[in-house]
Amino acid sequence: MRIAVRPFGVLGTAMASSGAVRKVAQGPVPGLAILDPAGLRFIRDGPRGAGGAAGQIYRWLEISEHDSFPAPVRQAIRAPLQAKLQYYGVRACLHVVGPDFSQRHCSEDEALGELTQAYGAALREFAGARLGGLRLLPISGGIFAGELKPQLPSLTAGALRAAFDALPERDQHAVSMARLDMCIFEEDEHARYAEAFAEETERAQQFTASLGMGRTPTQPWQTGVGV
C-alpha cells in the first residue's frame, strides 16, 4: 500500500489555525478519485444542504443543489460502513458513510472495527475501478469523532492497514499499484496524522523500492508544488 500524508484536504485547500482557508495544492485531476465522508441522511435525502467537507465536495461535483444522489449511490449505501464509487462526468467520488461516534460511547476496539469495515468498503470499490490514485480523508473526523477525536489519527492508520490486509490478493494488488494520499484539511492536525502514519509511509517507501523503480515520481497535484 503506497500512502503519503498530505497537508491539505481532498480538494487541495487547507485551513490554518486562524480559520483562514487557502489553496495549497492542485485540485483532483481525471483518473484521481476523492473520498466523500457522506452522511447517511444526505445519501437518502439528497446532497442539498450538506455542510463541512461533504458540502465542499458536492459543490465541486456540481451536485450541491440536486434533490437526490444518483440511483446507484442510493442503492449501494443503505447503512453506515458502506461505500460507492460514482462518476460525475470525469470526476470520480468515493462516497463512504462512516460511523458516528458523537452520539454514543464506543471503545477504541469497537471504533477500530467499525472504521476498518468502512475503509474496507471504500478500498474494495476503489480496487475495482483501476484508477491511478485516491485522495482519502479521515472517516468519522470532525464532529463525528466525539470523545474519540484524540485517538482518531492512530485509529485511522490502524483501520486502513487492517482493511487493506483483509482485501483479497487481487484487490490488494490493484490498490498497491495506485497512490493513496491521506489528506488532512486542518493544518494543526497534520503533524498528528503524519506521526500516526509514520510506519505506513516507511512501508510504502520500502514497497516502492522493492518494485525496482526507485521512488514514485511525485506530481504537483500531490504536493501543491507549482500551484
Positions of PLM-derived features:
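Macrodomain-like recognition of ADP-ribose-binding/processing modules
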Residues: M1-V227
